[in-house]
């Protein structure tokens, strides 16, 4: 049995499903990739363990982005803009009673988190990024992006087989978790998870939106402490794009790990969690010191 699911209501009336787990000293908003279902996530043991570990040193806030999972579905032909989905992070924080938080974005959740950190600086205590990039499609000045042929083939495959064991095996083998090829337990969970996370039309609409993602221009405007995490052989997001993030976000710290799995909870999750915990605790210490200094000033005044 997973945590209780609640709903945040956005300014335009949409309902966003969210959960709050843990009682740590700092809030941590976890922004999932492409699609999600906050209740189905807890059914995968390794993913549940990863989330539980995050909740052991933070007050973890999970949510399904607008259009996927348990949040309000939208028309596949009129999908919300990237900026609208980014603003939903703030609505979830409001509903969860969070004034400021560390924002942790993975995969597609990365650019959403970057945009939030750049435009909502007072609410962003820190930023953690894993397995992501500021741009997704190939360009002459971004040779690590996916090619037009890749996008066409991917969309065609999704249209034919979204939510089937065949598609789940392909995801595991080609980019999600190559080290878990042959793991039918993972395939069975992923098959059901995809169906509960998004309809075929919604998944396709999201992928088309992802093809247009490019938030490189906002990177210099991110001033929150930032930790960038990446696996050196991630087949979905080459490490060169990860390094570019660390170079362009002022003061960002980069941590690279061996590994070829894109799914953050597969493989060397302990190393990722150790880095994340160290970073969050450093932020907590800084906040505590700032509070102490402010209290001293107020007392002496």
Say what each PLM segment does:
Residues 257-270:
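Catalytic histidine-centered segment of alpha/beta-hydrolase-like enzymes
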Residues 114, 118, 124-159:
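Flexible "cap/lid" loop of the alpha/beta hydrolase fold
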Residues 7-72:
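Conserved HGGG/HGGXW glycine-rich cap/lid loop of the alpha/beta-hydrolase fold
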Residues 161-209, 218:
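Conserved alpha/beta-hydrolase catalytic His-Asp/Glu region
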Residues 46-52, 62-104:
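Active-site loop/oxyanion-hole signature of alpha/beta-hydrolase fold enzymes
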Residues 273-301:
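Juxtacatalytic helix/coil linker segments
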Residues 222, 228-230:
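Short beta-strand/loop motif that positions the catalytic acidic residue
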Residues 235-241:
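Conserved alpha/beta-hydrolase "acid-adjacent" motif
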